[in-house]
C-alpha cells in the first residue's frame, strides 16, 4: 500500500524489544519508512520503566530510526501544554536558553549545553537527531496560535504573529525531524462560537 510512516500513540506502552522488531521488519521493506511515537505512557502501566519505549529510553535503540516527540521542544518554545498562562521562549519567558539549545541539537549530546537547565531532560535522550521529533503543537490540545493569544493577551496582533514565526523558525532550523500541525502556518484557531477556545481534537471547529 506504499505506506511511508507509522506513528505510535502512547509508544511508551510498547516494550523496547517489540519496537526494535517492528523497525527491523520495516527496514526489510524500505529503510526510509518513518517510525515514531509519543514517548510517554499516558498513565500507569505494568511494563517496567526500563523496558518501556518512552522518550528516556530512546538511547537504547542505538542508531535505529525510531523517534519520539520532544515535549522539551514543545513546552520550552511556547510554554506548558496544559497551563494556558505559562509562557515559553518565543512569548517572553526568560531562562530557557539551554532548553532551546537542546531543541536545536535534536536532543543529542553536545558540548556547550548545560543539561541541568534543560526544561525536562537532564541528559541527551537521542543518539541521533533523527530520533527526535521537534514540534510545538499537534491535533491534541490548543493550537499554537490560541496558546500564544491566551498567554499574551496584552501583546499586539503583529507581535503574536512574530512569535508564531519564531516558533516555526526554531522547528525548521533545528536538527531532528520537524513536525507541524496543519494550519499552524496560517495561525489556525479552534475558537468556539462563545469566544472560548477548544483544546480537543475530535470536536474542534
Predicted regions and their residues:
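Short, intrinsically disordered, charge-balanced linker/junction segments flanking boundaries
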Residues: 201-205
Amino acid at each position: 500500500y506504499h505506506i511511508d510512516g507509522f506513528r505510535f500513540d502512547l509508544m511508551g506502552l510498547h516494550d523496547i524489544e517489540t519496537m526494535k522488531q517492528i523497525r527491523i521488519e520495516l527496514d526489510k521493506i524500505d529503510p526510509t519508512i518513518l517510525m515514531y511515537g509519543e514517548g510517554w505512557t499516558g498513565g500507569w502501566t505494568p511494563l517496567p520503566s526500563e523496558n518501556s519505549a518512552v522518550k528516556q529510553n530512546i538511547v537504547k535503540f542505538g542508531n535505529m530510526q525510531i523517534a519520539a516527540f520532544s515535549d522539551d521542544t514543545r513546552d520550552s518554545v511556547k510554554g506548558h501544554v496544559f497551563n494556558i498562562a505559562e509562557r515559553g521562549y518565543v512569548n517572553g519567558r526568560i531562562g530557557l536558553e539551554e532548553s532551546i539549545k537542546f531543541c536545536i541539537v535534536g536532543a543529542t549530546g553536545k558540548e556547550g549545553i548545560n543539561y541541568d537547565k534543560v526544561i525536562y531532560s537532564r541528559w541527551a535522550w537521542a543518539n541521533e537527531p533523527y530520533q527526535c521529533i521537534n514540534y510545538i503543537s499537534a491535533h491534541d490540545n490548543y493550537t499554537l496560535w490560541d496558546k500564544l493569544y491566551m498567554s499574551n493577551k496584552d501583546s499586539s496582533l503583529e507581535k503574536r504573529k512574530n512569535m508564531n514565526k519564531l516558533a516555526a523558525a526554531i522547528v525548521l532550523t533545528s536538527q531532528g525531524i520537524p513536525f507541524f500541525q496543519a494550519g499552524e502556518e496560517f495561525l489556525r484557531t479552534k475558537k468556539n462560537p462563545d469566544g472560548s477556545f477548544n483544546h480537543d481534537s475530535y470536536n474542534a471547529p
